[in-house]
Protein backbone atom coordinates (compact mmCIF):
# COMPACT_ATOMS: atom_id res chain seq x y z
CA UNK A 1 0.00 0.00 0.00
CA UNK A 2 1.29 3.46 -0.87
CA UNK A 3 2.10 5.75 2.06
CA UNK A 4 0.19 9.03 2.04
CA UNK A 5 2.87 10.87 4.02
CA UNK A 6 5.43 9.90 1.40
CA UNK A 7 3.11 10.92 -1.44
CA UNK A 8 2.62 14.33 0.15
CA UNK A 9 6.37 14.98 0.24
CA UNK A 10 6.47 15.28 -3.56
CA UNK A 11 4.60 17.79 -5.76
CA UNK A 12 1.01 16.61 -6.20
CA UNK A 13 -2.63 17.59 -6.44
CA UNK A 14 -5.65 16.19 -4.63
CA UNK A 15 -9.39 16.66 -4.92
CA UNK A 16 -9.36 18.91 -1.85
CA UNK A 17 -6.44 21.02 -3.06
CA UNK A 18 -8.04 21.49 -6.48
CA UNK A 19 -11.32 22.55 -4.85
CA UNK A 20 -9.43 24.84 -2.51
CA UNK A 21 -7.53 26.45 -5.39
CA UNK A 22 -10.69 27.03 -7.42
CA UNK A 23 -12.53 28.49 -4.41
CA UNK A 24 -9.67 30.76 -3.28
CA UNK A 25 -6.41 30.72 -5.17
CA UNK A 26 -4.85 33.15 -2.70
CA UNK A 27 -5.37 30.84 0.27
CA UNK A 28 -3.92 28.01 -1.84
CA UNK A 29 -0.86 30.15 -2.56
CA UNK A 30 -0.34 31.03 1.09
CA UNK A 31 -0.42 27.38 2.16
CA UNK A 32 0.93 25.38 -0.77
CA UNK A 33 3.30 27.80 -2.49
CA UNK A 34 4.47 30.27 0.17
CA UNK A 35 4.37 27.67 2.93
CA UNK A 36 2.81 30.02 5.48
CA UNK A 37 1.91 28.38 8.76
CA UNK A 38 -1.84 28.40 9.52
CA UNK A 39 -2.88 31.14 11.94
CA UNK A 40 -5.11 28.73 13.86
CA UNK A 41 -6.71 25.30 13.58
CA UNK A 42 -10.47 25.27 12.88
CA UNK A 43 -12.45 23.34 15.47
CA UNK A 44 -14.34 21.39 12.81
CA UNK A 45 -11.08 20.12 11.31
CA UNK A 46 -9.93 18.63 14.60
CA UNK A 47 -13.39 17.26 15.37
CA UNK A 48 -13.70 15.63 11.95
CA UNK A 49 -10.26 14.05 12.32
CA UNK A 50 -11.23 12.44 15.63
CA UNK A 51 -14.53 11.15 14.21
CA UNK A 52 -12.73 9.71 11.16
CA UNK A 53 -10.26 7.84 13.35
CA UNK A 54 -13.04 6.22 15.36
CA UNK A 55 -14.93 5.19 12.21
CA UNK A 56 -11.71 3.74 10.80
CA UNK A 57 -11.36 1.67 13.97
CA UNK A 58 -14.97 0.51 13.59
CA UNK A 59 -14.47 -0.72 10.03
CA UNK A 60 -11.07 -2.30 10.68
CA UNK A 61 -12.73 -4.26 13.45
CA UNK A 62 -15.66 -5.13 11.19
CA UNK A 63 -13.19 -6.49 8.64
CA UNK A 64 -12.16 -8.96 11.36
CA UNK A 65 -15.77 -9.92 12.00
CA UNK A 66 -16.25 -7.81 15.14
CA UNK A 67 -18.89 -5.07 15.31
CA UNK A 68 -17.92 -2.50 17.93
CA UNK A 69 -20.67 -1.28 20.26
CA UNK A 70 -21.68 2.31 20.75
CA UNK A 71 -20.09 2.52 24.22
CA UNK A 72 -16.75 1.44 22.78
CA UNK A 73 -16.98 4.09 20.06
CA UNK A 74 -17.82 6.76 22.64
CA UNK A 75 -14.79 5.82 24.73
CA UNK A 76 -12.60 5.74 21.65
CA UNK A 77 -13.78 9.20 20.62
CA UNK A 78 -13.06 10.60 24.08
CA UNK A 79 -9.49 9.34 23.72
CA UNK A 80 -9.04 10.66 20.17
CA UNK A 81 -10.56 14.03 21.01
CA UNK A 82 -8.44 14.40 24.13
CA UNK A 83 -5.25 13.61 22.22
CA UNK A 84 -6.04 16.26 19.64
CA UNK A 85 -7.81 18.99 21.57
CA UNK A 86 -7.03 18.90 25.30
CA UNK A 87 -4.97 21.99 26.23
CA UNK A 88 -4.66 22.87 22.53
CA UNK A 89 -4.87 26.65 22.50
CA UNK A 90 -4.29 26.75 18.73
CA UNK A 91 -7.84 25.52 18.09
CA UNK A 92 -10.32 28.28 17.33
CA UNK A 93 -13.79 27.35 18.55
CA UNK A 94 -16.95 28.82 17.10
CA UNK A 95 -18.99 30.97 19.45
CA UNK A 96 -21.01 28.81 21.81
CA UNK A 97 -18.75 25.76 21.50
CA UNK A 98 -15.76 24.52 23.46
CA UNK A 99 -13.78 21.37 24.21
CA UNK A 100 -16.51 19.81 26.35
CA UNK A 101 -19.38 20.58 23.98
CA UNK A 102 -17.55 18.87 21.13
CA UNK A 103 -16.72 15.91 23.36
CA UNK A 104 -20.40 15.46 24.19
CA UNK A 105 -21.51 16.00 20.61
CA UNK A 106 -19.01 13.52 19.18
CA UNK A 107 -20.02 10.82 21.63
CA UNK A 108 -23.71 11.37 20.89
CA UNK A 109 -23.09 11.21 17.15
CA UNK A 110 -21.13 7.97 17.38
CA UNK A 111 -23.78 6.39 19.58
CA UNK A 112 -26.31 7.24 16.85
CA UNK A 113 -23.97 5.80 14.22
CA UNK A 114 -23.63 2.52 16.12
CA UNK A 115 -27.39 2.19 16.52
CA UNK A 116 -28.35 3.20 12.98
CA UNK A 117 -25.61 1.99 10.62
CA UNK A 118 -27.13 -0.84 8.56
CA UNK A 119 -25.83 -4.36 9.01
CA UNK A 120 -24.38 -5.01 5.58
CA UNK A 121 -23.41 -8.32 4.04
CA UNK A 122 -20.19 -7.07 2.53
CA UNK A 123 -16.45 -7.50 2.47
CA UNK A 124 -14.32 -4.63 3.72
CA UNK A 125 -11.62 -4.20 1.10
CA UNK A 126 -9.88 -1.10 2.42
CA UNK A 127 -9.98 1.36 5.30
CA UNK A 128 -8.13 4.69 5.11
CA UNK A 129 -6.27 3.55 2.00
CA UNK A 130 -4.17 6.12 0.09
CA UNK A 131 -4.14 6.17 -3.70
CA UNK A 132 -2.18 7.85 -6.46
CA UNK A 133 -3.17 8.19 -10.10
CA UNK A 134 -1.52 9.60 -13.19
CA UNK A 135 -3.51 11.85 -15.48
CA UNK A 136 -2.52 12.62 -19.05
CA UNK A 137 -1.39 16.24 -19.22
CA UNK A 138 -0.77 16.46 -15.47
CA UNK A 139 2.96 16.29 -14.58
CA UNK A 140 2.27 15.53 -10.91
CA UNK A 141 0.22 12.68 -9.42
CA UNK A 142 -3.34 13.12 -8.21
CA UNK A 143 -3.47 11.64 -4.73
CA UNK A 144 -6.06 11.00 -2.06
CA UNK A 145 -7.30 8.53 0.51
CA UNK A 146 -10.38 6.32 0.52
CA UNK A 147 -12.14 6.28 3.89
CA UNK A 148 -13.73 2.92 3.10
CA UNK A 149 -14.06 0.52 0.18
CA UNK A 150 -16.47 -2.42 0.39
CA UNK A 151 -17.68 -5.15 -1.94
CA UNK A 152 -21.11 -6.77 -1.77
CA UNK A 153 -21.97 -10.39 -2.54
CA UNK A 154 -22.70 -9.55 -6.19
CA UNK A 155 -19.28 -7.97 -6.68
CA UNK A 156 -20.38 -4.32 -6.66
CA UNK A 157 -17.72 -1.98 -5.28
CA UNK A 158 -18.84 0.88 -3.04
CA UNK A 159 -16.50 3.76 -2.23
CA UNK A 160 -17.55 5.43 1.01
CA UNK A 161 -16.56 8.83 2.33
CA UNK A 162 -17.32 9.80 5.93
CA UNK A 163 -18.66 13.29 6.54
CA UNK A 164 -19.79 15.40 9.46
CA UNK A 165 -22.19 18.17 8.55
CA UNK A 166 -24.37 20.79 10.20
CA UNK A 167 -27.31 19.76 8.01
CA UNK A 168 -28.47 17.13 5.54
CA UNK A 169 -26.99 17.06 2.05
CA UNK A 170 -29.17 17.99 -0.90
CA UNK A 171 -29.45 15.70 -3.92
CA UNK A 172 -27.43 18.21 -5.93
CA UNK A 173 -24.65 18.29 -3.33
CA UNK A 174 -24.38 14.52 -3.47
CA UNK A 175 -24.59 14.16 -7.23
CA UNK A 176 -22.17 17.03 -7.88
CA UNK A 177 -19.60 16.16 -5.22
CA UNK A 178 -16.27 16.68 -6.98
CA UNK A 179 -14.26 14.58 -4.55
CA UNK A 180 -16.37 11.48 -5.15
CA UNK A 181 -16.07 11.87 -8.91
CA UNK A 182 -12.28 11.92 -8.59
CA UNK A 183 -12.41 8.89 -6.30
CA UNK A 184 -14.33 6.89 -8.89
CA UNK A 185 -11.78 7.76 -11.58
CA UNK A 186 -8.96 6.78 -9.24
CA UNK A 187 -10.63 3.47 -8.41
CA UNK A 188 -10.84 2.59 -12.09
CA UNK A 189 -7.15 3.34 -12.43
CA UNK A 190 -6.20 1.34 -9.36
CA UNK A 191 -7.59 -2.12 -9.85
CA UNK A 192 -11.33 -1.64 -10.29
CA UNK A 193 -11.57 -0.96 -14.02
CA UNK A 194 -14.55 -2.77 -15.50
CA UNK A 195 -16.25 -3.18 -12.11
CA UNK A 196 -19.60 -1.70 -11.15
CA UNK A 197 -18.86 1.14 -8.74
CA UNK A 198 -21.22 2.93 -6.39
CA UNK A 199 -20.35 6.03 -4.40
CA UNK A 200 -21.69 6.69 -0.92
CA UNK A 201 -21.51 9.54 1.54
CA UNK A 202 -22.01 8.46 5.15
CA UNK A 203 -22.96 11.62 7.04
CA UNK A 204 -23.20 12.27 10.74
CA UNK A 205 -25.45 15.30 11.04
CA UNK A 206 -24.64 17.71 13.89
CA UNK A 207 -28.23 18.64 14.73
CA UNK A 208 -29.49 18.95 18.32
CA UNK A 209 -30.48 15.30 18.07
CA UNK A 210 -27.74 13.81 15.84
CA UNK A 211 -28.69 11.85 12.75
CA UNK A 212 -26.88 9.36 10.54
CA UNK A 213 -27.69 9.49 6.83
CA UNK A 214 -26.34 7.60 3.83
CA UNK A 215 -26.44 8.98 0.30
CA UNK A 216 -25.75 6.82 -2.75
CA UNK A 217 -24.74 8.24 -6.10
CA UNK A 218 -23.01 7.28 -9.34
CA UNK A 219 -20.92 9.04 -11.96
CA UNK A 220 -20.99 8.78 -15.75
CA UNK A 221 -17.89 8.71 -17.91
CA UNK A 222 -18.73 12.24 -19.04
CA UNK A 223 -18.85 13.43 -15.43
CA UNK A 224 -15.49 11.80 -14.77
CA UNK A 225 -14.00 13.53 -17.79
CA UNK A 226 -15.41 16.87 -16.64
CA UNK A 227 -13.88 16.48 -13.19
CA UNK A 228 -10.49 15.62 -14.62
CA UNK A 229 -10.70 18.66 -16.90
CA UNK A 230 -11.17 20.75 -13.75
CA UNK A 231 -8.00 19.21 -12.34
CA UNK A 232 -6.06 20.12 -15.48
CA UNK A 233 -7.50 23.65 -15.50
CA UNK A 234 -6.45 24.12 -11.88
CA UNK A 235 -2.94 22.90 -12.64
CA UNK A 236 -2.73 25.27 -15.60
CA UNK A 237 -3.54 28.20 -13.33
CA UNK A 238 -1.14 27.06 -10.62
CA UNK A 239 1.72 26.51 -13.07
CA UNK A 240 1.17 30.04 -14.44
CA UNK A 241 1.11 31.62 -10.99
CA UNK A 242 -2.54 32.63 -11.11
CA UNK A 243 -3.90 32.85 -7.56
CA UNK A 244 -7.20 34.72 -7.57
CA UNK A 245 -8.71 35.45 -4.15
CA UNK A 246 -12.26 34.54 -3.27
CA UNK A 247 -14.77 37.37 -3.20
CA UNK A 248 -14.75 39.29 0.08
CA UNK A 249 -17.35 37.74 2.33
CA UNK A 250 -17.11 34.30 0.72
CA UNK A 251 -18.38 31.40 2.82
CA UNK A 252 -14.73 30.33 3.12
CA UNK A 253 -13.57 33.55 4.78
CA UNK A 254 -14.79 33.06 8.40
CA UNK A 255 -12.97 29.73 8.72
CA UNK A 256 -9.92 30.64 6.64
CA UNK A 257 -6.63 30.03 8.45
CA UNK A 258 -4.92 32.88 6.55
CA UNK A 259 -7.17 35.80 7.47
CA UNK A 260 -4.31 38.02 8.69
CA UNK A 261 -2.17 37.23 5.65
CA UNK A 262 -5.12 37.95 3.38
CA UNK A 263 -5.63 41.34 5.01
CA UNK A 264 -1.95 42.14 4.53
CA UNK A 265 -2.17 41.13 0.87
CA UNK A 266 -5.26 43.29 0.36
CA UNK A 267 -3.43 46.27 1.86
CA UNK A 268 -0.40 45.68 -0.34
CA UNK A 269 1.81 44.59 2.55
CA UNK A 270 2.40 41.17 0.98
CA UNK A 271 3.31 40.59 -2.68
Residue ranges and their predicted role:
Residues 43, 47, 102, 142, ...:
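Hydrophobic (often cysteine-bearing) scaffold residues that line and stabilize catalytic clefts
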Residues 8, 12, 173, 186-271:
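Metal-dependent nuclease catalytic regions and adjoining charged, substrate-binding loops involved
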Residues 28-34, 160-164, 203-214:
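Short acidic (Asp/Glu) and glycine-rich catalytic loops that position anionic groups and cofactors
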Residues 126-190:
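Non-catalytic protein-protein interaction segments used by genome-maintenance enzymes to assemble
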Residues 24-30, 150, 156-161, 232:
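Active-site-adjacent bridging/hinge elements
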Residues 54-128:
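A non-catalytic, helix-rich entry segment at domain boundaries
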Residues 18-19, 23-63, 103, 128, ...:
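Nuclease catalytic cores
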Amino acid sequence: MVDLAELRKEPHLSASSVSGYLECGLAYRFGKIDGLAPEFTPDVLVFGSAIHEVLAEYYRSLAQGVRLAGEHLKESFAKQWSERAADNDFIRYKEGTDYRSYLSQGQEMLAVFASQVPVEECTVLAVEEPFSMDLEGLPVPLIGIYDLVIEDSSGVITIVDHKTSAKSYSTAQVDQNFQMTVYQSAAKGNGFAGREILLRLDCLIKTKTPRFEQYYTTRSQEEEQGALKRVLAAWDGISKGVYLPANTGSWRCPGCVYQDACGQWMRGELP
